[in-house]
Structures are given as C-alpha cells and as structure tokens.
Amino acid sequence: SLKGQGAPNVGQQVRDLWYAQRDADDGCTLAAGEMVAQKKMTEDEVWRRARQSAEANRQKAVRDAVAIVAPEAVGQVAELFASPAKYLAGQSKSRGKERKELALLAIIRMASSAPEAAAGQIEGGWGAQLSSDELNWAWAVVGKQTAFKLQPEANSYFSKVRRDADLNDDLLGWKVRAALRAGDWKAVRKSIEAMGPERNESTWAYWRAKSMLAGRPSAEDRAEARQLFEDTAGTGSFYEQLALEEIGQRVTVPPAPAPLSAQEKATARSNPGLTRALYAINAGLRSEGVREWNYATNLHQAGGLGDRELLAAADLACQQQVWD
C-alpha cells in the first residue's frame, strides 16, 4: 500500500512513478503530498518534479507540485508561464528558497524558446541569487535547449555546470551529446559516469567506452573499455552492433524467429490491455489507444512483454490493420 507506513522505500516508488508521468495525475500528486507529509519524500524532490514539468510545458503538473510545498505561490505559476521575462523583472511575492525555485521555473520556461535570453537572465543577476543546485540546473536546461538546436555554444553552457550530480539523466544525456559534438571526451566520460541506471544502457555504455580510449588512455582504461564493449556487444540495437565491431566481431543478420504458435496468438488476443487499445483505435480514439498499447506492452509488467509476446502482439495489430 502507498498509504500509511507502507514499505520502507515507498517514498522512492512514489517519486519514481510521479517523475515518469508527463502529465498531471491527481492520484500520484496526492500520494506525493502524503509522502512529503510523512517525510518519505523531500521538498527538493517536489521542486525537481516542478522543474521537469516546466520544461515539458505542463503547467498543471507544475501547479500541482508547487501546491504541495508552497500552496500560497500557486497563483504565480500562471504568471511565470505567461511571461517569464515579465515575471523575472517584477517584484516577487515570495522569499527564500520558494522565490529562487519559482525564478528557476521562469528561466526554464524562457529557455524553451529563447535559451540565449535565459542565459542572459542567469548572467544578469539571477545566477548570483540561485543556490548551486538551482544554478547548475539552470545552465543545464539552457545547454539542452541550445544543443537541441545544434548550436555550437551548447557545450560552453554545459561547462558552467559545476556538479553533474545535481542533474537528472535526461539533462546529462544532452550534456553528453553536446560534448560529443564539441569533441570534449573528458566531459563525455564525466557526464555518463554521473548518470543513474541509465548509464548501463547500450548507448551510454558504448560512448563511455569510447571516451576511455580518447587521448592517451592508460592500460587500465583500455581494459575497462574493452570490458564495456564486450558487455554491450550484441545484435539487438545499433550501439550493441557498434560495440560488436569494436571487439573485432562481424555484425550478422539474426535468424528469423520461429512462426508463432496458435497458443501464442491466442494469448495475445486475450490480453485485456491489447484488446482495450485496439478497441479504442477502432473507435477513433487513436492517441488513447496507442497510449494503452504502449502501457500493455512496456509497462504493465516489469520489463515489459518478452520478445515472443511482442511478436504475437505485432501480429495481432497487423491482423487489425493497425500499423503504428
């Protein structure tokens, strides 16, 4: 149960589910509020949810998060979304940490459309008022938006981040991309090593190994890079295949899967999540149906459906002439 005392790590479970949601959800918001009240989640974690939602342009999700930690400031969310520049130039009604976090939300919103202007706000005075954590996040968001536009200044903005541990994996991923474009292998390695579990994904494992071989690698770096390539090598993804080539093996076409059995097809047809998804799509609710399909195949059970189950689901979709 997520209510009451619950499991020892219930706060982390709620936080992770909440962070994974792009849109606001009343149930998760209520659970997050309870976790904060029980001191199983921190206010900093709630503000981080607000930052992520501001970047995704989800005003209600930002408002819901702010309502947990600063209910008297909820009205300011609409103001900073409507005109970040005007909000930053005005006299804030809040003080202390609340004031700085709201200013950071405004900088994040500004960066989404005008990263150079957001950088100007940071350098023009707000940077001196933000905490080190807030400042690092602000520069990272500016760097991300600049990198997204393939502008050469991106790595320079990211270099202003003084502590990678203050960033989430999404921002660190963009920091890596900017560093790769700039040929900054030291930053590539440092940023990937600061990631959470995502660092073990084939993409980042491959680039981490490559960063270890840049410049003048030590024997230890060479050995560790080789081990990473060996652990990553395979045929399941692009970077797995690149890692395969790095250890001197050829990429070959995997054998065709065995035909689906009648039982496998029947299991797919009886899957309630897939059934709901196809029903919604056939009823004209395509976006809802696709969302239900993605949940049924990827999220309903830990690790998602297996390869054979996915193949059966794809076969079912083809029979219904659903191609996406």
Give the ranges of each region predicted by the language model:
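Cell-wall glycan-active module
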Residues: 1-324
